[in-house]
Amino acid sequence: MAGEIENGRRNGAVSGDPSLSGFSKLDAQERLERFIGSGVLTPGDLGILNGGLPSEIAENMIENRVGVFGVPLGFAVGVPIDDRVYFALPMATEETSVVATVSNMSKRVRENGSLTTEVLGRGTIGQIQFDFVEDPQGFEAIVLGMKDALIADINTNVIPKMVERGGGMTDIAVRHIPIPDGTHMTVVHVVIETCDAMGANIVNQICEYLKGPLEAATNSQANLRILSNLATERLISAHIELGGVDPIRGTLIERASLFAENDPWRAATHNKGIMNGVAAVALATGQDTRALEAGAHTYAAGSALSTWRMQGANLIGDMRLPIAVGTVGGITHIHPQVRLAQRILDNPSADQLARIIAGTGLLQNLGALTALTSQGGITEGHMRLHLPNLAIGCGANQHERGPLVNYLEEILAETGRVSATDAQNGLSLLRAQA
């Protein structure tokens, strides 16, 4: 498979494979030839790598566009995550040494260790805020009494296709938040498993849909209805075990970890190093990097995201990180370089991509510590702006996009939600009428 070295080679020829050595000494053309020779790239991919983002697509992604801002795209090589070694791991970053660090630490782990990850949850959280609830406990009892019916309604009438794909709404909870002025807020949390989508748009639409029945049942008024980027229901754990570590160096790394775990000033820089890897893979694969950054730093809340300890002769690194990513939706299907990056990674599921991102972050963290211890109402507005992407994503040509966007705007105005299925249906209708 493209981008992957078969598992049977991991403990043998991989570390000495000539195709994995010397990349830093090659010029750009030689690196591309090496990747073409190994099957990671095809000659046709060179136009995508060098062509950047087409103006036509960029024009529909943001408002007031005047150009395209380039960021270097590189490949970390030989990255071992779980039972695979990724020959090429796409990373987009402006910062020197990030790609090299992941490649160098990958070589160490391939030769004398392992990097494993685990998916700890798949739910995306949405929040519906109710301010000045007169009887919070009574409110909670009413909402929890409606829980099963609301979940069934959502799964049957709002997201049946997602349920068919193995996802759906799974939970409703109520939280009470004291405010320093002596008042309080009550917040309804909804949890939706969004399959391979990051899920922001559908979660926002579900929160909007639930506003009416919750207000009617509780005689309370909802304020904000929006997803949370603190993705505590989509945690990924990453674990590195590295042998052959000099005991003095290992102890220094452990003490550096303790420094970050107990000092927020150091924690900020420690965690920034992790995010160097996380954000680079996320950007290359078309993810919302701001959402990942916000969730990670809130989750850390002044402490370190990772811990490192010497256990006997081995250095052990552990990390948990909220990673809500998607391999469908957003720009994943319209940005040519993102599509290429996904293909190089063998078109991973959202779970697999989250594992890759977490593992890369922990490798980056290991590299940083090694170096340091050496010398020296959002739904409608947002969805309206997203409609051109839906039109492009379903295959509408330049002449069809305007009428299709108008059609989708009508659906959004009538129902408060719109989906890729609506776009496909609308395109079929337009073509039937042509």
Language-model segments: which ranges?
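C-terminal catalytic subdomain
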Residues: 285-291, 297-396, 401
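Glycine-rich, mobile lid/loop segments that gate access to catalytic sites or pores
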Residues: 122-261
